[in-house]
Amino acid sequence: MSIKVAILGHSQVPQTFHVQNSEISIFRRSGACIHHFDESPLRDILEDRFDLVFLFLGGNDIRADLYDCKPVIVGLKGILLRLKEISKEVRFVAIERRHYSVNNRFGVENAQYEHDRRQINNNLRKFCGRQNIRIVNTTTRWFSDHLGKDGVHFATEAQRELKQKFTNVINLCREQAIQGGSS
Protein backbone atom coordinates (compact mmCIF):
# COMPACT_ATOMS: atom_id res chain seq x y z
CA MET A 1 0.00 0.00 0.00
CA SER A 2 1.36 3.41 -0.98
CA ILE A 3 0.70 6.61 0.98
CA LYS A 4 0.77 10.25 -0.15
CA VAL A 5 3.15 12.42 1.83
CA ALA A 6 3.94 16.14 1.68
CA ILE A 7 6.89 17.93 3.23
CA LEU A 8 6.39 21.68 3.51
CA GLY A 9 8.87 24.29 4.66
CA HIS A 10 12.08 26.24 4.30
CA SER A 11 15.56 25.29 3.11
CA GLN A 12 16.05 22.59 5.77
CA VAL A 13 13.48 20.50 3.87
CA PRO A 14 15.25 17.98 1.63
CA GLN A 15 15.09 18.91 -2.07
CA THR A 16 14.47 15.30 -3.00
CA PHE A 17 13.28 12.47 -0.84
CA HIS A 18 12.18 8.92 -1.57
CA VAL A 19 10.69 6.23 0.63
CA GLN A 20 9.51 2.90 -0.75
CA ASN A 21 5.73 2.64 -1.23
CA SER A 22 5.28 6.38 -0.71
CA GLU A 23 4.46 9.22 -3.07
CA ILE A 24 6.28 12.24 -1.63
CA SER A 25 5.66 15.83 -2.70
CA ILE A 26 8.08 18.56 -1.63
CA PHE A 27 6.79 22.10 -1.07
CA ARG A 28 10.00 23.98 -0.30
CA ARG A 29 11.00 27.60 -0.42
CA SER A 30 14.44 28.75 0.65
CA GLY A 31 14.15 31.38 3.37
CA ALA A 32 10.45 30.66 3.86
CA CYS A 33 8.63 32.41 6.66
CA ILE A 34 5.06 31.96 7.85
CA HIS A 35 3.74 34.74 5.59
CA HIS A 36 5.08 32.83 2.55
CA PHE A 37 2.54 30.05 3.16
CA ASP A 38 -0.01 31.92 1.05
CA GLU A 39 2.43 32.19 -1.87
CA SER A 40 3.51 29.58 -4.40
CA PRO A 41 5.06 27.02 -4.09
CA LEU A 42 3.96 26.58 -0.46
CA ARG A 43 0.24 27.29 -0.94
CA ASP A 44 0.10 24.71 -3.74
CA ILE A 45 -0.10 22.03 -1.05
CA LEU A 46 -3.73 23.03 -0.44
CA GLU A 47 -4.70 21.77 -3.91
CA ASP A 48 -4.36 18.10 -2.97
CA ARG A 49 -5.09 15.57 -0.21
CA PHE A 50 -2.45 13.63 1.72
CA ASP A 51 -2.10 10.81 4.20
CA LEU A 52 0.72 12.62 6.01
CA VAL A 53 2.09 16.18 5.99
CA PHE A 54 5.24 17.47 7.70
CA LEU A 55 5.45 21.22 8.45
CA PHE A 56 8.95 22.65 8.93
CA LEU A 57 8.56 26.43 9.34
CA GLY A 58 9.17 29.02 12.04
CA GLY A 59 12.95 29.36 12.38
CA ASN A 60 13.19 32.12 9.76
CA ASP A 61 10.48 34.11 11.54
CA ILE A 62 12.71 34.67 14.58
CA ARG A 63 14.40 37.99 13.84
CA ALA A 64 15.94 40.87 15.78
CA ASP A 65 12.73 42.90 15.31
CA LEU A 66 10.53 40.10 16.74
CA TYR A 67 9.50 41.56 20.08
CA ASP A 68 6.59 39.21 20.62
CA CYS A 69 6.43 35.54 19.62
CA LYS A 70 2.64 35.56 19.52
CA PRO A 71 2.33 36.32 15.76
CA VAL A 72 4.65 33.40 14.94
CA ILE A 73 2.71 31.08 17.25
CA VAL A 74 -0.66 32.18 15.86
CA GLY A 75 0.62 31.84 12.28
CA LEU A 76 1.97 28.33 12.81
CA LYS A 77 -1.23 27.23 14.56
CA GLY A 78 -3.28 28.53 11.64
CA ILE A 79 -1.15 26.68 9.10
CA LEU A 80 -1.31 23.45 11.11
CA LEU A 81 -5.12 23.66 11.27
CA ARG A 82 -5.29 24.24 7.50
CA LEU A 83 -3.03 21.23 6.93
CA LYS A 84 -5.30 19.07 9.10
CA GLU A 85 -8.09 19.80 6.59
CA ILE A 86 -6.12 18.18 3.74
CA SER A 87 -4.28 15.38 5.54
CA LYS A 88 -5.10 12.43 7.77
CA GLU A 89 -1.91 12.99 9.80
CA VAL A 90 0.13 16.15 10.40
CA ARG A 91 3.56 16.42 12.00
CA PHE A 92 5.18 19.66 13.15
CA VAL A 93 8.97 19.70 12.92
CA ALA A 94 10.07 21.60 16.04
CA ILE A 95 12.00 24.78 15.35
CA GLU A 96 15.66 23.83 15.28
CA ARG A 97 18.57 25.33 17.16
CA ARG A 98 20.93 27.61 15.27
CA HIS A 99 24.29 29.23 15.97
CA TYR A 100 24.31 32.65 14.35
CA SER A 101 27.55 34.45 13.71
CA VAL A 102 27.87 38.14 14.60
CA ASN A 103 27.03 39.19 11.02
CA ASN A 104 23.89 37.21 10.30
CA ARG A 105 21.15 38.29 7.94
CA PHE A 106 18.43 38.32 10.61
CA GLY A 107 20.42 40.38 13.10
CA VAL A 108 19.21 38.12 15.90
CA GLU A 109 21.51 37.22 18.76
CA ASN A 110 21.91 33.55 19.65
CA ALA A 111 20.41 34.08 23.12
CA GLN A 112 17.33 35.82 21.70
CA TYR A 113 16.86 33.18 19.01
CA GLU A 114 17.12 30.39 21.59
CA HIS A 115 14.66 32.12 23.95
CA ASP A 116 12.11 32.73 21.20
CA ARG A 117 12.58 29.26 19.71
CA ARG A 118 11.88 27.63 23.06
CA GLN A 119 8.85 29.81 23.73
CA ILE A 120 7.34 29.03 20.32
CA ASN A 121 8.09 25.29 20.53
CA ASN A 122 6.70 24.99 24.08
CA ASN A 123 3.49 26.74 23.10
CA LEU A 124 3.12 24.61 19.98
CA ARG A 125 3.77 21.38 21.89
CA LYS A 126 0.71 22.11 24.03
CA PHE A 127 -1.38 23.09 21.01
CA CYS A 128 -0.28 20.08 18.99
CA GLY A 129 -1.09 17.77 21.89
CA ARG A 130 -4.67 19.07 21.94
CA GLN A 131 -4.94 18.78 18.15
CA ASN A 132 -3.47 15.26 17.88
CA ILE A 133 -0.50 16.60 15.90
CA ARG A 134 2.79 14.95 16.76
CA ILE A 135 6.16 16.68 16.97
CA VAL A 136 9.29 15.67 15.05
CA ASN A 137 12.15 16.71 17.32
CA THR A 138 15.17 18.41 15.77
CA THR A 139 16.02 20.44 18.86
CA THR A 140 18.54 18.13 20.51
CA ARG A 141 22.14 19.08 21.10
CA TRP A 142 23.10 16.43 18.49
CA PHE A 143 21.39 18.41 15.71
CA SER A 144 22.91 21.71 16.85
CA ASP A 145 26.34 20.06 16.94
CA HIS A 146 25.88 19.04 13.29
CA LEU A 147 25.19 22.38 11.65
CA GLY A 148 26.93 23.58 8.52
CA LYS A 149 29.49 26.40 8.46
CA ASP A 150 26.71 28.99 8.30
CA GLY A 151 25.41 27.88 11.72
CA VAL A 152 21.89 27.61 10.31
CA HIS A 153 21.58 24.66 7.94
CA PHE A 154 22.08 21.03 8.88
CA ALA A 155 25.36 19.45 7.83
CA THR A 156 25.34 16.14 5.94
CA GLU A 157 25.04 13.99 9.07
CA ALA A 158 22.07 15.96 10.39
CA GLN A 159 20.39 15.93 6.97
CA ARG A 160 20.68 12.14 6.96
CA GLU A 161 19.23 11.95 10.48
CA LEU A 162 16.32 14.22 9.52
CA LYS A 163 15.56 12.03 6.50
CA GLN A 164 15.68 8.97 8.76
CA LYS A 165 13.20 10.59 11.16
CA PHE A 166 10.89 11.36 8.22
CA THR A 167 11.30 7.81 6.89
CA ASN A 168 10.43 6.30 10.28
CA VAL A 169 7.24 8.37 10.56
CA ILE A 170 6.25 7.60 6.95
CA ASN A 171 6.75 3.86 7.47
CA LEU A 172 4.77 3.95 10.73
CA CYS A 173 1.88 5.80 9.07
CA ARG A 174 1.91 3.37 6.14
CA GLU A 175 1.81 0.39 8.55
CA GLN A 176 -1.07 1.97 10.46
CA ALA A 177 -2.93 2.53 7.18
CA ILE A 178 -2.42 -1.11 6.23
CA GLN A 179 -3.64 -2.32 9.63
CA GLY A 180 -6.60 0.07 9.51
CA GLY A 181 -7.53 -1.11 6.02
CA SER A 182 -7.46 -4.79 6.95
CA SER A 183 -9.68 -4.60 10.02
Language-model features, listed with the residues they occupy:
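Conserved SGNH/GDSL esterase-like catalytic core that processes O-acyl groups on lipids
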Residues: 2-81, 99, 115-118
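Alpha/beta-hydrolase-fold catalytic nucleophile elbow
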Residues: 56, 93-94
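Short acidic/His/Gly/Ser-rich catalytic and metal-binding motifs that mark active-site loops
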Residues: 62-63, 99-104, 143-146
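A short helix->loop->beta-strand "cap" motif at the edges of active sites that frequently abuts
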Residues: 85-90, 133
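Short beta-alpha junction loops
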Residues: 87, 94-99
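Acidic carboxylate-rich catalytic motifs and surrounding loops in phosphoryl-/glycosyl-chemistry enzymes
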Residues: 95, 133-147
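Substrate-gating cap/lid alpha-helix
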Residues: 100-139, 152, 156
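Histidine-centered active-site loop/cap adjacent to the catalytic His
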Residues: 147-183
